[in-house]
Amino acid sequence: SRFESKIINRGSIVGSSFTANDMGTIEMNSVTNRYGDTEWSIPDVGVRQALMSDYDLAVPVDQFDLLKLIANPQGDYLQRCLAAVQRKKDAVIYAALKGSALRKTDESGSFSGQALPAGQVIAAGGTGMTKAKIITARKQFRTNEADEHNGEEQYIAYDAGMLEDVLSDTTLTSADFMAVKMLQEGDISGKWLGFKWVPYEALTGTSTKTTMAWAKT
C-alpha cells in the first residue's frame, strides 16, 4: 500500500466500528485577582466514528488446469490478489481523506458528517497543479500548526497529470539539486516544498481531479 504507512494504523479492530477522540486547542488565562473564582476553559471536543467495511477476492483455479501446466500459477495469482488488497487499502484511505468525518460533540447526540472546511480546499481555478497551489497548501499546514515544527509528517498524492504539470513548470525545475534530480529521473517522488510526494493513479475526477495533502496524525 502506498498510503498505509503514511497514516496512523489502528491495527485489528473488533466490531463494526471504532471511535477516536479529538480536542481543540486551549490557552492560559490571566489571573487578575487573588482568591477569585476559577475560570474554566472548555475546549472543543468531539468523537469521530469510523465504520468498518468488508471486502474479499476469490479466483478459481481448476485442478485439471493445474495438471496441464508446467509452472504452478498459484504464485502469480497470489501476488495479484495481494496487489489488489494493497490497491483497495489505498482507495479506502483516499476516500476517507476526501470524504466527511462522522462526528458528535455530546454523548446523547448522533454522529453527523463533517466535511473538510472550505478554507482548507484549494480551488482548481482552471489550471493544473502549480507552484502557487503547493505553497498555499504548505501555508495551510503552518497556519494550523500541523507541520514539521509540531512533529508532523506531511504528504501529498500525485498522479501522471500532476507529474507533467510539475515537470513542465520552470519555476519548480530551475533552481536547486532536487529540481535537477527531478529532470534527470523524470520523477517527483521524495520530499520537497515540505511534502513527501506519493504516487497514486486513482485520483477521482474527469477533467478536474482532486488530490489530497495530509499530516500523518
Segments (PLM) and residue ranges:
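Alpha-helical scaffold segments that mediate packing/assembly in large oligomeric complexes
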Residues: 64-143
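Short Gly/aromatic-enriched secondary-structure transition segments
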Residues: 33-40
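A general structural signal for short secondary-structure junctions and capping/turn motifs
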Residues: 9-12, 143-149, 187
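Short, Lys/Arg-rich flexible segments
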Residues: 1-7, 90, 147
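Short, catalytically relevant binding-site loops at active-site mouths
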Residues: 99, 161-165, 203-205
